[in-house]
């Protein structure tokens, strides 16, 4: 599972980590990285900060540049 923590660009600053509720909260969990990037492109974002869940307990945060 991939969770988008932040979406940046075109005035968007959305958080999906529970610290701030947004109307897009339901769209922050993706089955794969391709779906997350498609979401970013669809909304005209300049980047995503992703949290990848690896083997359940390990997490890795990856800030992305322009996608």
Predicted regions and their residues:
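Short aromatic-glycine-(Arg/Gly/Cys) micro-motifs in beta-strand/loop hairpins
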Residues: 1-25
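Residues in well-ordered beta-strands of folded domains
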Residues: 6, 31, 51
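A short, charged, amphipathic alpha-helix used as a generic interaction element across diverse proteins
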Residues: 20-48
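Short, mixed-charge low-complexity intrinsically disordered segments
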Residues: 37-67
């Amino acid at each position: 599972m991939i969770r988008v923590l932040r979406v940046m660009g075109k005035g968007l600053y959305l958080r999906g980590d529970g610290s701030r509720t947004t109307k897009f909260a339901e769209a922050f969990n993706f089955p794969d990285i391709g779906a997350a990037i498609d979401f970013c492109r669809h909304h005209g974002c300049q980047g995503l900060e992703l949290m990848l869940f690896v083997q359940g307990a390990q997490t890795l945060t990856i800030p992305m540049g322009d996608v």
